[in-house]
């Protein structure tokens, strides 16, 4: 029997999907990401959303101002697609190195997405420009029609939006973000080199029973919502397979405690403090630690055409307990796995 590893040292990872928010929240959460990750794809769903080059430059500076001096961190900015976005503005930002990618939110799919796209037909000119530029399209893959069950919205999106779009624009580079279903796992596995995907730690570790059975756990509520066990298992098998087009994207999405623990709570898990160790735990459980570094540190840069990070990060098998809360201004955050023992800890 092979002895359990006590230390994991990997090339410094990146987070290919994170929400850093703004204001006091941004100042609180940025260090949790910048401490561990060399780069992060920053979501643009502020209020108002990031739709111009100038707004992205200003937001990037606010992020950098919140990075502790001893952290080496590069925020990679994204443009929020709307029905009326100017393709020339998008191209200008991409050519100037301000925008790394553009984000497609179906209108009202998640937090601050009311400005999102009502139909991909409305942004076809923009998407054609992105295809020409080789600019990645990041997709929140859910339909938002009220008659479609919330647990079916990702599968329906593949059928009615994603596949028709990729057939129409066959040179478009697409990241299917935070996939949650066997349908999506199969779709990505069978896809070509222009289709990538991110997966969150919560969707690998938990299913809807964990969120709903024996009491509602609002801090596991995120969008896309946790699915049944068969889907969780499909995601775990996908990462364990070593698929080179699947990479780390935490979708860390902080909300103040009072906005989660309420009669109509917000969607999102603040997992930045524990995500890397959580991923390592899943890979170990799947006997797939041989693929952990690629998932965390190599596959994302490979898909985006960027160099891998210099330096390394070390995780140690050292059980620690996640704090119950994290202070923010005059409120608190409840982190993912709050109060729970975690198996792998990033060595500081």
Curated annotation (Swiss-Prot):
The modification N6-carboxylysine is found at residue 103. It comes from the Bacteria. Its EC number is 3.5.2.3. Binds 2 Zn(2+) ions per subunit. It catalyses: (S)-dihydroorotate + H2O = N-carbamoyl-L-aspartate + H(+). Belongs to the metallo-dependent hydrolases superfamily. DHOase family. Class II DHOase subfamily. This is Dihydroorotase. It comes from Cronobacter sakazakii (strain ATCC BAA-894). The lineage of its organism: Bacteria, Pseudomonadati, Pseudomonadota, Gammaproteobacteria, Enterobacterales.
């Amino acid at each position: 029997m092979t002895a359990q590893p006590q230390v994991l040292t990997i090339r410094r990872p990146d987070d290919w999907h994170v929400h850093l928010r703004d204001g006091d929240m941004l100042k609180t959460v940025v260090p949790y990401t910048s401490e561990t990750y060399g780069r992060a794809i920053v979501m643009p769903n502020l209020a108002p959303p990031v739709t111009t080059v100038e707004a992205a430059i200003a937001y990037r500076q606010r992020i950098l101002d919140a990075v502790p001096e001893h952290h080496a961190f590069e925020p990679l900015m994204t443009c929020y697609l709307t029905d009326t976005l100017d393709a020339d503005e998008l191209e200008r930002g991409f050519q100037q190195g301000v925008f790394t990618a553009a984000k497609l939110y179906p209108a009202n799919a998640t937090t601050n997405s009311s400005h999102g796209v009502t139909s991909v037909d409305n942004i076809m000119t923009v998407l054609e420009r992105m295809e020409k530029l080789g600019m990645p399209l990041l997709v929140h893959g859910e339909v938002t029609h009220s008659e479609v069950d919330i647990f079916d919205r990702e599968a329906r999106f593949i059928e009615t939006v994603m596949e028709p779009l990729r057939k129409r624009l066959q040179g478009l580079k697409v990241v299917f973000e935070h996939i949650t279903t066997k349908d999506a796992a199969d779709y990505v596995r069978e896809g070509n080199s222009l289709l990538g995907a991110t997966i969150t730690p919560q969707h690998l570790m938990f299913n809807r029973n964990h969120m709903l059975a024996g009491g509602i756990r609002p801090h596991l509520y995120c969008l896309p919502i946790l699915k049944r066990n068969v889907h969780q298992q499909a995601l775990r098998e996908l990462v364990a397979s070593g698929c080179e087009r699947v990479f780390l994207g935490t979708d860390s999405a902080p909300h103040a405690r009072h906005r989660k623990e309420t009669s109509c709570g917000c969607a999102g898990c603040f997992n930045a403090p524990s995500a890397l160790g959580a991923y390592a735990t899943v890979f170990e459980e799947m006997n797939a630690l041989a693929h952990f570094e690629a998932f965390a540190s190599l596959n994302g840069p490979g898909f985006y055409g960027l160099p891998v990070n210099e330096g390394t990060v070390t995780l140690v098998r050292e059980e620690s307990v996640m704090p119950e809360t994290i202070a923010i201004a005059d409120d608190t955050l409840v982190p993912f796995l709050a109060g729970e023992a975690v198996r792998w800890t990033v060595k500081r």
